[in-house]
Amino acid sequence: MAHKKAGGSTRNGRDSESKRLGVKRFGGESVLAGNIIVRQRGTKFHAGVNVGIGRDHTLFALTDGKVKFEVKGPNNRKFVSIED
C-alpha cells in the first residue's frame, strides 16, 4: 500500500527556442555585401543607404563598407547605412 499520495500533473514546462535577434554588426564595423547587419521583428531599424531589407525585416549590406547607425526624421527613426 502506498504511503504517499499521487502527485498532480502540471501544464507548464515548455519554452520556445530563442530566435537570436539583434544587431549583428555594430557601428564602425566593416562589412561585405550580403552581410547581415540586424535581425529584427518589424522595422525597429530602417534601411538607409546601401542597405537592403529582407522578407522578415532583416537588414543586410548591399555594398562593402562601414556600418553607420543614425537617428533622423520627424519621428526619430533609427536608420542603418553603409558608408564607403
Swiss-Prot record:
Family matches, as InterPro entries: Ribosomal_bL27 (IPR001684), Ribosomal_bL27_CS (IPR018261)
Q: Which UniProt keywords apply?
A: Ribonucleoprotein, Ribosomal protein
State the Pfam families in the record. Ribosomal_L27 (PF01016)
Give the domain of life: Bacteria
Disordered: annotated segments: 1-22
Any GO MF annotation of the entry: structural constituent of ribosome
| Disulfide-bond pairs as recorded | none
The entry's cellular-component GO terms read: cytosolic large ribosomal subunit
Name a single GO biological process: translation
Annotated family: Belongs to the bacterial ribosomal protein bL27 family.
PANTHER family, sorted: LARGE RIBOSOMAL SUBUNIT PROTEIN BL27M (PTHR15893:SF0), RIBOSOMAL PROTEIN L27 (PTHR15893)
The name on file for this protein is: Large ribosomal subunit protein bL27
| Taxonomic path | Bacteria, Pseudomonadati, Pseudomonadota, Gammaproteobacteria, Alteromonadales
The primary gene name is rpmA
